[in-house]
Regions:
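Glycine-rich adenosine-cofactor-binding loop
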Residues: 2-17
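NAD(P)-binding Rossmann-fold cofactor-contacting core
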Residues: 21-39
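Rossmann-fold NAD(P)-binding glycine/threonine-rich loop
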Residues: 70-75, 88-126
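Oxidoreductase and adenylate-handling cofactor-binding alpha/beta cores
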Residues: 119-134, 148-158, 186-200, 295
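Catalytic, metal-anchored helix/loop core of enzyme active sites in primary metabolism
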Residues: 134-141, 146-152, 164, 170-175, ...
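Substrate-binding/catalytic subdomain of NAD(P)-dependent oxidoreductase enzymes
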Residues: 162-265
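A conserved regulatory-domain signal marking ACT and ACT-like small-molecule sensing domains
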Residues: 296-298, 302-384
Length: 384
């Protein structure tokens, strides 16, 4: 296999380093903004040197972002090249277009590292769904958020924990995609499309991040025997899919509560096989690069071109997803009064309320400048 590598940052450099030990998978050209000693004569700053080279049969895209990644992936496929990517942003935004094009051109399109980093999640999901019905996918899918929450449990502030995460390379300089939820949302969206063999758009999934979490919120939940995580969940029942990303509280001793630091836990619930979970590093140079290399080996072994066949829109109805919440706010609002089950100091425990309704209410408070925090309490069947 002759490989063209689009991008030589953290992941791209890791892929190149791993592949030096495998003569069967040869990186023959590297696109980067600048050359290094490791690239030597393979360096180019022109994408066409890779995309138009007939000797290159597989392209690895690890640039990040939607553009020009989408255009270059598409051009590679039209040239009859297989594509492996770790770029969740472009896969989520252009899912149907890229999967359709890979079929049209009869080339492989793999993106295991885009949803799970170093965890072989999508390939495992691909395998189990052939023999069982996937009822739900779920998990703690962002290591940056999990590290921040783990640090805050020790008494530190959100800002201090974020700064530590950035210093360790767990969070980007602009942490918005991590702490506000889009990174988790994209992983859930990709996982849901594959699990339920159809298409759900990013904007069909309600999403909230952890930016409003305070140290005292974690202390309050700890008194209740709960730990906070940024939780992704999607389930299919009676032909309808419900999905959400939001802060959620889990009982101490549960598997999700036990995931600490920058680790991820991703899993699914099967009709016959029960719960299946995977734990590992969801990001990082070599964990992510290793998943890219696994995809390359699958392509070389002529494994399936993609993980699922369906591209038809799924019937999304998030109103069927109802949860109890713990809410901290100074607002006095008729809706809040209506859903209050009990008051506990600065916090309110709600009656079960639909996720879209709660998210809309929280967004309206924030739009008015009212500070608010909310943690869902998912039903046990969602995670155990």
């Amino acid at each position: 296999m002759n490989i063209g590598l689009l991008g030589y940052g953290t992941v791209g450099g890791g892929v190149d380093r791993i592949l030096r030990e495998d003569p069967a998978l040869k990186v023959t050209r590297v696109l980067s903004l600048f050359s290094t000693e490791e690239m030597a004569s393979r360096y180019t700053d022109r994408a066409e040197d890779i995309l138009k080279d007939p000797a290159i049969d597989t392209v690895v895209e690890v640039l990040g972002g939607i553009h020009p990644a989408y255009e270059w992936i598409s051009e590679a496929m039209r040239a009859g090249k297989n594509v492996v990517t770790a770029n969740k942003a472009v896969v989520a935004a252009c899912y149907r277009e890229l999967v359709s094009l890979s079929r049209e051109m009869n080339v492989s399109f793999r993106c295991t590292a885009a949803a799970g980093g170093g965890i072989p999640w999508l390939t495992s999901l691909e395998r189990v769904k052939k023999n069982d019905r996937v009822e739900a996918v779920f998990g703690v899918m962002n290591g940056s958020c999990n590290y921040i929450l783990s640090e805050m449990e020790k008494g530190g502030s959100f800002d201090a924990a974020l700064k530590n995460a950035q210093a360790l390379g767990f969070a980007e300089r602009d942490p918005s995609a991590d702490v506000d939820g889009p990174d988790t949302l994209r992983k859930l969206m990709i996982s849901s499309c594959i699990a339920f063999n159809g298409y759900i758009a990013e904007d069909e999934i309600p999403c909230r991040g952890i930016r409003t979490v305070r140290t005292e919120d974690l202390a309050f939940l700890k008194e209740k025997g709960l730990k906070l995580k940024l939780f992704a969940y999607a389930a299919e029942k009676d032909g309808k899919v419900a999905a959400a990303v939001e802060p959620a509280a889990f009982p101490e001793g549960s598997a999700l509560a036990g995931i600490t630091k920058n680790l991820n836990l991703i899993g699914c619930r099967l009709q016959y096989g029960g719960m299946l979970t995977f734990t590992g590093e969801g990001a990082g140079r070599y964990p992510t690069a290793e998943n890219v290399v696994r995809d390359l080996r699958d392509v070389a072994a002529f494994r399936p071109a993609f993980y699922a066949d369906g591209l038809q829109p799924l019937h999304v109805d998030n109103t069927v997803l109802k949860r109890i919440y713990y809410v901290r706010t100074s607002a006095e609002d008729p809706f809040l009064e209506k859903i209050t089950a009990e008051k506990d100091g600065a916090y309110i425990k709600t009656l079960p309320v639909s996720v879209p309704e709660m998210h809309a209410f929280l967004s309206s408070l924030e739009a008015d400048g009212t500070p608010v925090f909310a943690a869902a309490v998912p039903e046990e069947e969602a995670y155990a």
